[in-house]
Amino acid sequence: MSASPTAGQAGLSYRDAGVDIDAGDALVDRIKPFAKRTMREGVMAGIGGFGALFELSKKYQEPVLVSGTDGVGTKLKLAFQLNRHDTVGQDLVAMSVNDILVQGAEPLFFLDYFACGKLDVDTAATVIQGIARGCELAGCALIGGETAEMPSMYPDGEYDLAGFAVGAVEKKKIIDGSTITPGDVVLGLASSGAHSNGYSLVRKIIEVAKPDLDADFHGQRLQDAIMAPTRIYVKPLLSLIETLPVKGMAHITGGGLTENVPRVLAQDVTAVLHRDAWTLPPLFQWLQAQGRVADDEMHRVFNCGIGMVVIVAKEDAERAIRHLQAAGEAVWQIGEIRERAEGEAQTIVI
């Protein structure tokens, strides 16, 4: 029996199966200029090859590679609902580069994974343009990625994202929290909003409260406040690390303040945070009021206006604050480190 189509019959194609190779090629052409703007020293071969090549700088004597991977979570559901895809790319980059930053690593390169049921070139290009913008803010190269069109795997109009960042730090300069002692000061850097965490609760609050997402909210639309892209702290904090001893950092992501700060603390110390040291931003006030969310729940779900925590010696605190403010960051002294009492939580908000 012949496997070839008989006369008058058209053979099946990949397009018939739901995969548009031409659309994929068109997307690659669209995103190449975005990726090109992120190129930096060390990139040997980027988008287009089977593997991307990156050469470590000779400035490192004992380089340690630091890697991180993350997604954007259910914030994507709001992106689909609102048909706005311009911010989630920066979110994707921020989640990984901010994570590797806390160990003192300079982000070197980034790869993305974009998966969908049916590829919409305009939507995907908008997302990847945001990824490239995030890479520029972090100083890392968008060196490669994967776009997977998988019919029936995702509903029309929906997609998922994953990102992967690799950075490097000098071995003797790794920041791991091991030098944190009682009396050290906890600094908090302002977030730009809810960043990319707690959005299952955000969506539930929206479902229950049914707000007008186009309504004015402190000078912008409510949806703009909710969808604000995650702040990327790489450049100001790398500069700070070169200026004075940073003992520890915590990226405030899933788990909020009370579950992320302990990740950089030894078992014998506690971070005491003072809620009156900074003003709870309007978005979080609105979320708490509309959802009747308890204070403790707010602190373990949301960043509550603090996107990154930095721990320094007391004598370095004022200089660190001035340095970060000069770099454009809003920063507050939000607490201190003390000896941990038996059975006490490692981060408490009072």
From Swiss-Prot:
Cellular compartments per GO CC: cytosol
Gene Ontology BP annotations: 'de novo' IMP biosynthetic process; adenine biosynthetic process
Catalytic activity: 2-formamido-N(1)-(5-O-phospho-beta-D-ribosyl)acetamidine + ATP = 5-amino-1-(5-phospho-beta-D-ribosyl)imidazole + ADP + phosphate + H(+)
Record's subcellular location: Cytoplasm
Keyword Cytoplasm: yes
Signal peptide start and end residues: none
Molecular function as annotated in GO: ATP binding; phosphoribosylamine-glycine ligase activity; phosphoribosylformylglycinamidine cyclo-ligase activity
Keywords, ordered alphabetically: ATP-binding, Cytoplasm, Ligase, Nucleotide-binding, Purine biosynthesis
InterPro entries assigned: PurM-like_C_dom, PurM-like_C_sf, PurM-like_N, PurM-like_N_sf, PurM_cligase
EC code: 6.3.3.1
Protein's UniProt keywords contain Nucleotide-binding: yes
Membrane-spanning residues: none
Pathway: Purine metabolism; IMP biosynthesis via de novo pathway; 5-amino-1-(5-phospho-D-ribosyl)imidazole from N(2)-formyl-N(1)-(5-phospho-D-ribosyl)glycinamide: step 2/2
UniProt cross-references to Pfam families, sorted A to Z: AIRS, AIRS_C
Similarity annotation: Belongs to the AIR synthase family.
UniProt xrefs under NCBIfam families: purM
The protein's name in its UniProt record: Phosphoribosylformylglycinamidine cyclo-ligase
Organism, as annotated: Cupriavidus taiwanensis (strain DSM 17343 / BCRC 17206 / CCUG 44338 / CIP 107171 / LMG 19424 / R1)
